[in-house]
Amino acid sequence: MLRRNRRPVCYTFRVFAAPQVRLLFVEAANSVLYAHCCLLNYGRASGIGLMPLSTPVSRRALRHSRVIDVQAYVRDDGLWDIDARITDIKSYDAMLASGPRPAGTPLHDLHLRITVDHALTIVEAAAASDSVPYPGFCDTIGPAYRALIGLNLLKNFRRDLKQRLAGIAGCTHLTELAQVLPTATVQAFAGDVWSTRDGENADLSHEKPFQLDKCHALRTDGGAVAQYYPRWVAKA
């Protein structure tokens, strides 16, 4: 497993594959229960409106949960580390080619770390595998992910990632995990790299906030920009 000996976490993001994923974690993977409960309680305590999916129309049983966890760190040397982890856990005993995998035991537990400079260019990369379906084979691919070094997270990153590490050149799941790195890194460090504020708190009063026109909600001809960034409303 990758070592984590840096300063405390700067930002943490967790993506859960299904709203009922807590059931599997309670029954079979208590080691992550605390983190999940923190997320649920944060939403309630902070007053953030939770918007769950509609109630399922039929009873159902959980089969599989995939969890993606990304943590961003500020290093003492001025660089930034992004640690990403992906786990796959089944709710039933699975018979793999390599042998049985009991319910709640990770089928995949994979780690990917990149180090980026303030231009979001990757200057170091490492991968490690704690749980894999084919021990001795899947877990030999880690060194291949040094191919990420030199790529920039905001300049054709996903295209270049596919060219270097798709198919037999990499691990399907590590390469898929790498695809979340650009947006997770932007969430962590956007204010350090670009101007994201407006009005009296603007970093650069003449520069449009970075996030505008990057998604449907912040289109400059839309209501959100009219309300929160009126200076940048697109002129008809």
What is the role of each PLM region?
Residues 49-80, 85-90:
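Short, Gly/Pro- and small/polar-rich lid/capping loops
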Residues 64, 86-236:
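Active-site- and interface-proximal helix/loop "cap" or "latch" segments in soluble metabolic
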Residues 3-7, 14, 22, 44:
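Basic polycationic patches enriched in arginine
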Residues 5, 17, 27-30, 41:
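Intrinsically disordered, low-complexity polyampholyte segments enriched for Lys and acidic residues
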Residues 2, 23-24, 33, 39-40, ...:
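Leucine-biased recognition of intrinsically disordered, low-complexity hydrophobic segments
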Residues 10, 37-38:
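Cysteine-centered motifs
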